[in-house]
Amino acid sequence: MNPLFGPNLFLLQQEQQGLAGPLGDPLGGDHFAGGGDLASAPLASAGPSAYSPPGPGPAPPAAMALRNDLGSNINVLKTLNLRFRCFLAKVHELERRNRLLEKQLQQALEEGKQGRRGLARRDQAVQTGFISPIRPLGLPLSSRPAAVCPPSARVLGSPSRSPAGPLASSAACHTSSSTSTSTAFSSSTRFMPGTIWSFSHARRLGPGLEPTLVQGPGLSWVHPDGVGVQIDTITPEIRALYNVLAKVKRERDEYKRRWEEEYTVRIQLQERVTELQEEAQEADACQEELAMKVEQLKAELVVFKGLMSNNLTELDTKIQEKAMKVDMDICRRIDITAKLCDLAQQRNCEDMIQMFQKKLVPSMGGRKRERKAAVEEDTSLSESDGPRQPEGAEEESTALSINEEMQRMLSQLREYDFEDDCDSLTWEETEETLLLWEDFSGYAMAAAEAQGEQEDSLEKVIKDTESLFKTREKEYQETIDQIELELATAKNDMNRHLHEYMEMCSMKRGLDVQMETCRRLITQSGDRKSPAFTAVPLSDPPPPPSETEDSDRDVSSDSSMR
């Protein structure tokens, strides 16, 4: 393999020239008119830039990795493709210059008959002067004019690397030309990669000294080893190779596209995984904060339950005590009112009995008449001058007895054992009226079980407990309002009863006065009409109660009521 035609040659061509053209662009005849130097456009047009993958910049690392992963076979096929294209370009160029080369070779043979032999001609290498557009960095591309050296010298001027030494004519040509031009020509043609070395094949066909140059018909040239190369058309092998290379290129592009898609998906997945990891860390931090808050809420709930239980217990105790006091007060006052009414009625009956059950006996002697006259005189004197001292003492004793009786009745009422189930105000200790903390036991157990099973329902339990407390507090408030309303109603009833009792007492005093007046009138009229009847008992009956006694009794009863 010729090291001058490596794969890097065409990569450098693509980077430096940046030209793209169809394969096998023919060279015009005007490039070689007048024996001028060759242009660099044919090889550039026949270069691999037309088949190189598009892209303004160098291949990305992903493409390089994909290219390395596809294996060495693709690289080998690519290298062969590039070398075949270069070879075909050179063959086309040689075909176009075939006739010119024949003339130049004929002239060279005629000029060098005497100094050279067939063996030397056989081994002589002739450089065609084809200058490739690819040049090493730092070496300028020289466009040598046609008048500098004749065509024979350009054809026969062999480089230093040729098997044979330089000819005389070539040396003369080089001496006739300028030093700078010769140096530029040698530096640009001898060492430029891509220059074509052709070997002229001269064989002795006869015993003579003159060798005979065997030249082909123009479509082929004869290799020194006798191998003929067909250059007029592309062989099926090369076409098949092109097809294989195109298929490999398509597969490579498909693999590249798939790899880029997978690479993009992989990058997206990595970014998504990173985001999920960050979210997981944030979720862990939030979970720790929520756990701390749950612990704090548990502690606050315990304290809250303790405070609420204490407050509710105190409230229940106060409600029960107030209800019992209300019941006791109402029952006591109603019973006192009933007792006082009974006492007043009994007193009225006793007064009437004492008034109408006086037993009169007829007087048998003058002493009885004198006593009766003395009594009448005393009565008339008492009506005119006021009561005397014995009658005042009797009235005081009667008032004291009445006061003692009232004190005894009040002491009995105070000592009376009131039962709790009295229904004076229809107060009953039922589930609707009596509310204790024991009613919350079921809710507390349910809340404890819910906390043990599911911690996430703690907030719900707190809300339910608060709503339950609010509901119970509202019920307590309604119960208290109802009790206060009933208490106010009872107070109004008691005041009304007190006013009625006071009216009854005033009516009773008026009736007592009238009854006393009637009794005295009846007594006086009876004494006048039936003087024969006298009283049976020896002791004088107690005088009837006067208005002062009635007033004292009313005042004592009013004070007891208050």
From Swiss-Prot:
Region listing for XCCR4 binding. Required for localization to the double-strand breaks (DSBs), in residue ranges:
453-528
Q: Which UniProt keywords apply?
A: Coiled coil, Intermediate filament, Membrane, Nucleus
Which residue ranges are recorded for the region named Disordered? 154-187, 364-401, 523-562
IF rod domain location is: 73-529
Write out the coiled-coil annotation as residue ranges. 85-117, 237-301, 458-504
Task: Tell me the InterPro entries matching this sequence.
Answer: IF_rod_dom (IPR039008)
Quick one: where's region LMNA binding?
A: 65-116
User: What biological process terms from GO does the record include?
Assistant: DNA double-strand break attachment to nuclear envelope; double-strand break repair via nonhomologous end joining
Q: What is its main location?
A: nucleus
Q: Where in the cell is it found?
A: Nucleus; Nucleus, Nucleoplasm; Nucleus inner membrane; Nucleus matrix
- Alphabetical list of Gene3D superfamilies matching this protein: 1.20.5.170, Vasodilator-stimulated phosphoprotein
Quote the biased-composition stretches of kind Low complexity, using this chain's numbering: 168-187
Record keyword Nucleus present: yes
Q: Read off the SMART domains from this record.
A: Filament
Composition bias of kind Basic and acidic residues appears in: 553-562
Function as written in the Swiss-Prot or TrEMBL entry: Nuclear matrix protein involved in the immobilization of broken DNA ends and the suppression of chromosome translocation during DNA double-strand breaks (DSBs). Interacts with the nuclear lamina component LMNA, resulting in the formation of a nucleoskeleton that will relocalize to the DSB sites in a XRCC4-dependent manner and promote the immobilization of the broken ends, thereby preventing chromosome translocation. Acts as a scaffold that allows the DNA repair protein XRCC4 and LMNA to assemble into a complex at the DSB sites.
What's the subunit arrangement here? Forms a heterotetramer with XRCC4. The interaction with XRCC4 is direct, involves LIG4-free XRCC4 and leads to relocalization of IFFO1 at the double-strand break (DSB) sites. Interacts with LMNA; the interaction forms an interior nucleoskeleton and the recruitment to DNA double-strand breaks.
The entry sums up its family as follows: Belongs to the intermediate filament family.
What's the protein called, per UniProt? Non-homologous end joining factor IFFO1
Organism of origin is Mus musculus (Mouse)
* Gene transcribed to yield this protein: Iffo1
